Amino acid sequence: MNVLHIDSGILGEHSVSRRLTAAIVAQIKADRPDANVIYRDLVSERLQHLTGAQIMAPADLDGVDPALASDVRTGRQMLDEFLAADTIVVGAPMYNFSIPSQLKAWIDRLAVAGKTFRYTEAGPEGLAKGKKVIVASTRGGHYSAGPAAAMDHQEAYLRTVFGFFGITDVEFVRAEGLNLGADQKQFAIAEAEKTIAEGDVLRLAS
């Protein structure tokens, strides 16, 4: 089984989303010692945001500007990693009601017609069916219910874009209210880690 582990939290060792994705992957490895894990830290790797030059780059990169060619190859490799994965673990903190720009840059490299989706007479069709996505979702406030739920452009976006790719099995391990005091932060992390340890969310694609 192939597992793709993605981190996008910018707080390094202080990042709760990184703590949770590490726990998820550790649980997967405990349950499936044969799992092959590929790790991408989208912050330290400094993936470039999408440009017109990237989109227009030819399939054959011979003669292309070396910096552009390197960037395009990186994007293609990330797409290949995604397509090869059975389970994708994504650390996705909420920043300003949405996802980190680093994570959006990664998703932009995945959204390739003919690879993760295609257009048909009946409408778009996802081509990445059969995968499982587990998202470690962290938020400073509470956005899963109540009036603030309308501000959620994080989980809603991720469910939509992975669904567009054909992935219907998307689970969220959520830690909310992390900026509402030490007790609430400790409680939210403990509840998320309990969810991971109980394993229901980790019923994996194989």
Swiss-Prot record:
Instruction: Quote the record's binding site residues for FMN.
Output: S15, V16, S17, M94, Y95, N96, F97, T138, R139, G140, G141
Q: What class of enzyme is it?
A: oxidoreductase
Cofactor binding comment, as recorded: Binds 1 FMN per subunit.
Q: Name one GO molecular function term.
A: oxidoreductase activity, acting on NAD(P)H as acceptor
Gene3D superfamilies per the record?
3.40.50.360
Does the UniProt entry include the keyword Oxidoreductase? yes
Cofactor(s) required for function per UniProt: FMN
Task: List the catalysed reactions.
Answer: 2 a quinone + NADH + H(+) = 2 a 1,4-benzosemiquinone + NAD(+); N,N-dimethyl-1,4-phenylenediamine + anthranilate + 2 NAD(+) = 2-(4-dimethylaminophenyl)diazenylbenzoate + 2 NADH + 2 H(+)
Cite the entry's keywords alphabetically. Answer: Flavoprotein, FMN, NAD, Oxidoreductase
Q: What is its EC number?
A: 1.6.5.-, 1.7.1.17
User: What Pfam families does this protein's entry cite?
Assistant: Flavodoxin_2
Q: Which InterPro entries match?
A: Flavodoxin_fold, Flavoprotein-like_sf, FMN-dep_NADH:Q_OxRdtase_AzoR1, NADH:quinone_OxRdtase_FMN_depd
Its biological purpose: Quinone reductase that provides resistance to thiol-specific stress caused by electrophilic quinones.
Subunit structure of this chain's protein: Homodimer.
Q: Which family does it belong to?
A: Belongs to the azoreductase type 1 family.
What HAMAP family does this protein map onto?
Azoreductase_type1 (MF_01216)
Q: Which PANTHER family would you find in this protein's record?
A: FMN-DEPENDENT NADH-AZOREDUCTASE 1, FMN-DEPENDENT NADH:QUINONE OXIDOREDUCTASE
Q: What is this protein called?
A: FMN-dependent NADH:quinone oxidoreductase
